[in-house]
């Protein structure tokens, strides 16, 4: 996903690209925005920008290593970049269950981030719907978010900032995504 494919939020796009261009990439960020504000697409574009070669404020040359996503996730994002949690549950076939990010997932995150990056560059961990982390998961990730390995970036994406535990929030740079302007939405 490219920044040019994201509707509106120009000030946030500029902030994110300037931080990378100036070598000031925060190790932990929390993108907070209601459904439809573009927080998830922005996080994906930002991750690509951090991981890939950039020209003119975009990831134009790509990086095959950054395309190692789960097949179902990639399919959903390609078809519906502004998807919501219900769409993801539907894609997984768990329409009637309540999603939660548990300690097992936290263990997998810790394990994957202890590995060196493929080409010695950044490692970016996106955690979508971060408010779904249970307390055990949040506590397991806390130390890693506080003191991540070199060139490791966490981007947590949430709709409800108040449901994120305060110790996690205090370690993140928080970016709020306002509702899209009517002029951005018009065809």
Indicate where each model-derived feature is located.
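Conserved AAA+ ATPase core "coupling" helix
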Residues: 165-187
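Short regulatory helix/loop adjacent to the ATP-binding pocket of P-loop NTPases
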Residues: 136, 140-145, 160-171
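Clamp-loader machinery-focused feature within the broader ASCE/P-loop NTPase space
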Residues: 2-136
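Sensor-1/coupling segment of RecA-like P-loop NTPase cores
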Residues: 127, 133, 148-165
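Conserved catalytic/switch belt of AAA+ P-loop NTPases
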Residues: 114, 139-156
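Small/polar loops that bind or transfer phosphate-bearing groups
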Residues: 8, 129, 156-157, 176-177
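Short glycine-/polar-rich loops that comprise or flank the Walker A/P-loop
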Residues: 25-27, 120-122, 148-152, 162, ...
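Switch/connector loops and helix/strand junctions flanking conserved nucleotide-binding motifs
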Residues: 39-41, 135, 163-167, 183-184
